């Protein structure tokens, strides 16, 4: 279909937007959300506190603007506990900070008084920008060391804190003779670590003005994909609880910020007995950060193994929202700020599609209450404002990156807070069942991890954006298609609601082993049952998931709901906000080395979305370009969408016709004349149609004659390509420089530590397709464009090649 061509050019066309043009929001528009931004203490200077704070807000303040939720900064004082654990209580003493094993990258010396002045200056500077009640928190990672880059004095003093590498809160500390704020004469022998650290943290926050503690990666058990012995996880959870109780008792106003360590939310409870709901409902947790990694980890590490796929992280978020619903705890997914994170992940940020995609995915993941009311997450936690993790300790992320991320986050959040409908599947979380399994089924393989299986279906083209609690099941909050996981230990009222729903024609799906399904919920009408093979929680590639996804699509089709025509990997969440239907299409990949472009066929139900008759088209959210129309009056609108690997776009569904479609001519079209020794490459993964023509021989040319008002030449820029001359109707009009070294782009400059990772990532993922030349406003009639290999190149280029992928003919 022609839709394919125009959608392809939408993908190519918005590269210009992603390279610097940003959406400007009206001052009257506000994102109804919290926004916390992480920054390494390395950025701030004790000998120039005011200057470094002013520089921070001068650069980063736009990210806090137009936000009417909570605003704050989370300072990273070297990951380890040292700053607080070794706190003497004397503001004139030097604070203990971890040391780097890497020379020349050490923290400055800070006294308690200087750190207090830093906190005070941050708050006063924030108020000058109109950010009242601005919060300052610190985080700790909790391990004995990290990446072999930081060494902890606390670990040297008290290695018994880490009996099995992981922190053990209830570890009895050995007596010592050091001076501490709460024990001036040394820690008494046998003092539990949780008690000592809670008292130290309370004293430190009072003395310095710190408002919160983020328990980064030491909030939940560190084996998030395993089932530890029950006594281990019980000991860990009770230690965390005891710490929070003691901390809140000593410092009630201190914000306690949890952090889930990138593990599955069901795994925390079912596998390890970590009951975040109990903590939050007892006011021990104020915020909960979902380590959803909005670029880093998601692509580079093989996502089917490391559970870092886009779908997996969205599923984790959805389950966490259901876990913490009805509490006061604020849920904040983590999104990376382009260029700000970390040693071997900094290269992954070249494609801003990923930043945009993650922000929209997470902002528009909803929890459905008993009455069916939808609520999004409470905001974002952003990492990092500075580039210390990318080995640039004296630089902040760029103005361009700030501007881009602000526009993205604000727009996504505003769409979320006007939500009226979340289409597709709805995951029903079963807290009682997970608690029972944790206490009674330890040592059993974790095949019932609901977030894993939910993400299987999302990966395979089943639209899903929401979650709910199984005990709240009703026709009001069932959504388009309820998915129930391990439905046993379910209240009788909910069972009755489920039975009634299916008897009256509602379709549902039940996932779980036979012994995890209540007998009253077996053999229901209009129900798909799936008993997924047990797995260790690390391998996503369930062989029968595709068959199940096909069954669901068939149910959708039969029910007059939106569906995907062919079974392909990919996400396409849909929701309705302020009367507008949104769609996001993501080309998910299981393995980087097999990454390919895809064409998705998405079928949209007029009835489901409340659409009228007549033509509809997709419209890009950021450039308002009309793309791909369906001119039929059928009940189902059909759109074909081209998406490169690991990419996505966000659009709305609008009534009316699209403008005349451009025509894409692939490089294999017989109307293109090749002269010389051109090679045909059929493995060009990110090219249109996954192929291209290549030549490095001087004088070789490709010539194309067309009729239209303009034309664009699509090709590749890379580190092995040289110059080509462009001729239009016999006249030289342009010289293309095909050289590009993506590893030197500002957004992905990183240390030598990352070199091998960077090369692999660029090889498979970085989109190299470029508009090499474009012209418009041509006279009516026939025109000829010719691309000639010059046999010359930049000194840095490794070869003289020229690549031709396609020609876009403009018909208007």
Question: Language model features by range: what are they?
Answer:
Residues 444-524, 628-652:
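Helical hinge/lid and interdomain linker segments adjacent to catalytic or ligand-binding clefts
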Residues 42-45, 49-50, 106-110, 117-118, ...:
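Active-site-adjacent "subsite" loops/lids of carbohydrate-active enzymes
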Residues 38-40, 133-144, 214-216, 234-273, ...:
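Aromatic-lined carbohydrate-recognition surfaces of secreted/lumenal glycan-active proteins
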